[in-house]
Amino acid sequence: MKLKDIYAFCVKEGIKADLRTSKQIESRLQEKKKEYRKLPQGLRRYFDKESLKNPYSDTRILFGDPELDIKSVLIGIDIGVEEVLLADQLSKNGKKIDLVISHHPEGCAYAGLYDVMHLQADLLCNIGIDKDIAESFMKKRIGEVERKIHGANHEKVVDAARLLGVPLMSCHTPADNHAASFMQNLMEKEKPKKVEDILDILEGILGSRFANVTESLNRYGPRILL
């Protein structure tokens, strides 16, 4: 499977699992196209053209030839320079790693993380909140995240991957969409009445699927934080 096909598959499956309507997703893409058309010709080369067809700004091929054939992948929630080095060393020791995939974004995908948060406003609309109120509610939080990550060293991990020749991509919101869709379907099926009922449901799933870590669930399993 080629790198570009893995990337396209992630985006496609993310859209399929998105809790928003197809109309809402298309509307966000149209906003990006309108934004692009308004730019002076000289500035268009700086525009993230991938955002014209991919509604998830936190999911990108960060380094690597899109035509590269991929047979083995190292994937993790967080990928730092150390994991890129691990992939490089594994390849040198005979365990070839063709691609590293990070769930949490790096590079331009991290720099654009705030932009994908507009989907939260769409979801608020879907539960009956007025669009203007939803947009206003999210605007402050989106601005906070944008300012927080603006000065970050976005390219640190990507540069390490480039220097070592390790292909790298991130897949954030598409994966989160599947988690959200799973939870939505689960809650609709189980119909919990109290928050503690939700914990019981989640602990039951974790206990059955990860029996070897059941004793540790009280440390890092589901918890009520508020």
Outline where the language-model segments fall.
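Hydrophobic structural segments
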Residues: 1-226
